[in-house]
Amino acid sequence: MAPGSHLVLAASEDCSSTHCVSQVGAKSLGVYAVNYPASNDFASSDFPKTVIDGIRDAGSHIQSMAMSCPQTRQVLGGYSQGAAVAGYVTSAVVPPAVPVQAVPAPMAPEVANHVAAVTLFGAPSAQFLGQYGAPPIAIGPLYQPKTLQLCADGDSICGDGNSPVAHGLYAVNGMVGQGANFAASRL
């Protein structure tokens, strides 16, 4: 791939990169959908494994792209569970109380230089994750200045709202455009 932009998406449902393509203009854009069995069954005993599978795949892909295409600027994004995957993959350390052997090692610090932006839509809050025994999402310090976290008003997954409908409105409430503009401005 020629130097350009690469979008790594961790999402709970099929995503379209059409809006992103219009934002990067003449630059080349590649899209990679993280390969993991996304689910909204947070109470399932298999749920933690699905998230770990996503972290492993996203981290491997980001690191591989950084090595094989060092001039390419990557954007990491996700919605809901995908936002959790994207957030966890940026962590500088394995969360306390998580067995180190059960999860992928954090990405090498130099990989952060290849990630232009991280956009998280409806990332589950610490309170929400805690209900299921999951650690809070801790964006690594090298990624914090390039991360945009968006939570819709009333969203009960990422915020303190009480509207289950709000969590499904990102595609129509303007926040996808806001995230795309943020990412494009960093490329």
From Swiss-Prot:
GO annotation terms (biological process): lipid catabolic process
Keyword Phosphoprotein: no
One GO CC annotation: extracellular region
Active site annotation, chain numbering: S80, D155, H167
Subcellular location: Cytoplasm; Cell membrane; Secreted, Cell wall
Single Gene Ontology MF annotation: carboxylesterase activity
Broad class of enzyme this protein falls into: hydrolase
Domain of life: Bacteria
InterPro entries: AB_hydrolase_fold (IPR029058), Cutinase/axe (IPR000675)
Keywords: Cell membrane, Cell wall, Cytoplasm, Disulfide bond, Hydrolase, Membrane, Secreted, Serine esterase
Site (Transition state stabilizer) location in chain: Q81
EC number: 3.1.1.-
Disulfide bridge map: C15-C69, C151-C158
Family statement drawn from the similarity comment of this UniProt entry: Belongs to the cutinase family.
PANTHER family: CUTINASE 4, CUTINASE RV1984C-RELATED-RELATED
Main function: May have a role in cell wall processes. Does not exhibit cutinase activity.
Extra remark: A single nucleotide (T) insertion is observed in the Rv3724/cut5 gene. Cut5 is expressed as Rv3724a/cut5a and Rv3724b/cut5b in H37Rv strain.
Protein name as catalogued: Probable carboxylesterase Culp7
Lineage: Bacteria, Bacillati, Actinomycetota, Actinomycetes, Mycobacteriales
Gene behind the chain: cut5b
